[in-house]
Amino acid sequence: QEIYSNTVNITVTPYSSLLDLSTSLGVVGSATPGGWGNENILDLPFYTTATTNVYVAYVTLRNGEIKFRNNNDWSENWGDDGADGTLDSYGANIAVSAGTYKIEVNFSSMTYTMEEYSWGIVGSATTNGWGGPDMMFHYNSFQDDWRAVVTLGDGEVKFRFNNDWGVNYGDDGADGTMEANGANIAV
C-alpha cells in the first residue's frame, strides 16, 4: 500500500562547506614570522566574528613589536600611542612578549585586547609528565588549525588550555570523543 503526504515547498540555499571568515586585516611586526613587511610572507590574518567591526587573530609571537594593518600595506595601519589598549591610526608599535595570543580588535570602540591563549598536551606519556609545562600546540593562522609535533611514550595524556586545569579535555569511554574534564587518554 502506497502512502502519500501533503506537498511542502522548501527553499534550499547551497553554501560552501568551508566557511570563509578571512579579512584583509593582519598583524605585522618584528614579533611575527614576516617581520616588518617581508614581501614573501603575508601578515598574520584576522578573522571576522559575529560582532560587526570586531575581528580576532590567534598568533604565536616572539619578543618584539607589532602593529595591525590592512591589505599587507602601510596606507592603513594601527598601533597604540599610549600602551592603553586604544587603537590609534598610524600609532606607535605595540611591544609584546613571546607567546601565543588571542588578539581582538574592535573598530567600533577603537580598542584591542591581547590575552594568552594556548593549548597543550600534558601527562605521563609526555617528556614533562603531569607537572608540565605542557607540550604546546602552535596555531597555524594560514590554515586555521592547531598543531603539535610531540613524541609520546607509554602512559596517559590530557589536553588543556593555558597550562591550567580550569579547562581540560579527556576521553570518557575511550571512544575518540573528547569531553570536558574527561578521563585520561591512554597512549
Task: Put a short name on every predicted segment.
Residues 1-187:
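Insoluble glucan recognition modules
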